[in-house]
Amino acid sequence: SYSMEHFRWGKPMGRKRRPIKVYPNSFEDESVENMGPEL
């Protein structure tokens, strides 16, 4: 799960990491489980 998310959002979010605030309703749940340890 983590490796897949990291590969998908690792590139676009690695630099921006801002879109998470644009639509937290959709990423909040995934961000906490998948990107939780990264953030």
UniProtKB/Swiss-Prot annotation:
Q: Which Pfam families match?
A: ACTH_domain
Q: Does the keyword Cytoplasm apply?
A: no
Q: Which keywords describe this protein according to UniProt?
A: Amidation, Cleavage on pair of basic residues, Hormone, Secreted
Instruction: Give the record's GO biological process terms.
Output: neuropeptide signaling pathway
The cross-references to InterPro entries, in alphabetical order and at most eight, read: Mcrtin_ACTH_cent, PMOC, POMC-derived_peptides
Chief site of localization: secreted
On this chain, the residues bearing Methionine amide are 13
* Compartments where located: Secreted
A GO molecular function term, named singly, is: neuropeptide hormone activity
Say if the entry is tagged with keyword Secreted: yes
**Into which family does the record put it?**
Belongs to the POMC family.
Question: What is the designated name of this protein?
Answer: Pro-opiomelanocortin
